[in-house]
Amino acid sequence: MSKIVLRPGDPNDANRDYLPEAIKTSQMVVNENGNNSQPMPPRLKEFHEDIVGDGLKDYWYEYVPESYDPAKPTPLVFSIHGGLMTGWGQCIYTSWTYVADREGFICVFPSAHARRFWQIMCEPELKEVLSAKNPEDIYLNDFPEDIRENHDANLILALLERMKRNYNIDEGRVYMQGMSLGNAMTQMMARFYAHKFAAMAGSAGPARKTLLFKADGTPEFQSLPVDAWQARMELDQPAPACSDDYEDVIAYNRDYWLKINGCTALPRIRLFGENGLAFFHGEKADYVFRDVKNRDHGQTFDDAELVWDYCFSGVRRGADGTIVHTGTALPTENDTVSVACVAGCRRAWVNGEIRSMAGEAFLWQKLKYHGLQGNQIVRGEYLMAPLSFLAETVGAALDAEDGNRSCALTLPGGGTAQFAQGSIGAVVDDRIVSMDCEAVLREGELYVPMAWFLRNLAGLQASCSRDGVYATDHETRLSTHITRLLRDLLKD
């Protein structure tokens, strides 16, 4: 196994083109909050042939690392570019070639045949709008109703056969990953040709509900189970002409593969840095959901590494067509310590399990109104959780008085804390400390700001989203779509 060595590039910070053509013949690199590139890999080879056999010539790019051993059956990864991109562009906007250097697998980066747009299926009600020609030349290519007549799908199938002829490919370890429109292409291939792949991964580019589900809620396509990975960017936006709530769109795409793969158990959730990962184990295949905090449309440069480490590295399709899990390069485990609540939920996430609370979590605003002639300014908004739940979670003994209007805690290490309705102050080890906001009595339960409590009395690092809190023993940042996932898990 070889080691990864990053190659320096020449930054072009003045660039504003989506895919600068000069990158192909230089060492230029670009960085944007959605696309970050590497210099053009010297071993990347371009091909231009009629490989499908229908008279049309296609471009594709093969990367065979120096670490490739022709004596060993070798995994194969297809990586599919987004709209207005190319195969070589997808190569440099990912780290697949670096991971291939270390692991020894082969990569193929095909280019869409026409206009740098794949022939993808789209929602029937959007086909006319999304296929309408416009001055910007940003519209979908027409696609045949019969997948067997889809040129781009046939290109990928033909490339698979070519790679098996030319290299020692492990037929049980063929994978596909795509970005944006490439994710849509990957998902289309998964719906029709999953039997040829062990796992499919994608970043951005989710489909609307009407493409995935029938009116009765059953999947529109009876796809063969396949390990699936979906990465979402927190700052991404819905596709043009899509009026659906974007959080719902993300959830529908997640639910599709959970149903196809038979994932009914609770996921294992792990957050680190700006990454949120949820690992679902299914009766037929597994599913991984990833959300990236503060990221725009595209794919992160380390997406390939994460997909390999937590998904592709540990799955193959057996000779009988079933999915076989062999253990991933990195463990798909829960955070060792985790406490999470979402506004409006009476249940909480604690160390990989769901716990009931005495009341639902809610948001409380800290206001400034002095000197504003009757007006007010919201200076902060905090998720409030029942003190009884927080005490139980950290192993503290609770002594309540006056109908829970005053509560004292004895912490596991012998420390003490006392809280009272309407007081922003808490008494911690016989000293006054200000919380983020005052304690609130609701339905007979005393509530305190959850993040403040876990940071100050449990020594955890708490991250807040718009209406959720996730606390653990390391630095992380809770994102919008992980919060939505938690809400879906915790709602009654």
Locate the predicted segments by residue.
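Primary recognition of N-terminal secretory signal peptides and signal-anchoring hydrophobic helices
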Residues: 317-492
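A domain-start/cap signature at the N-terminus of enzymes
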Residues: 1-76, 148, 177-195, 270, ...
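Extracellular/periplasmic catalytic domains that process cell-envelope and extracellular macromolecules
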Residues: 53-55, 69-73, 98-103, 169, ...
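The feature captures the conserved acid-bearing segment of alpha/beta-hydrolase catalytic domains
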Residues: 198-284, 296
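Histidine-bearing beta->alpha loop at or near hydrolase active sites
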Residues: 272-277, 287, 291-298, 310, ...
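Primarily recognizes the serine-hydrolase "nucleophile elbow" in alpha/beta-hydrolase
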Residues: 164-224
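Alpha/beta-hydrolase
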Residues: 78-80, 203, 292
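Serine-hydrolase catalytic machinery in alpha/beta-hydrolase-like enzymes
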Residues: 51-61, 72-169
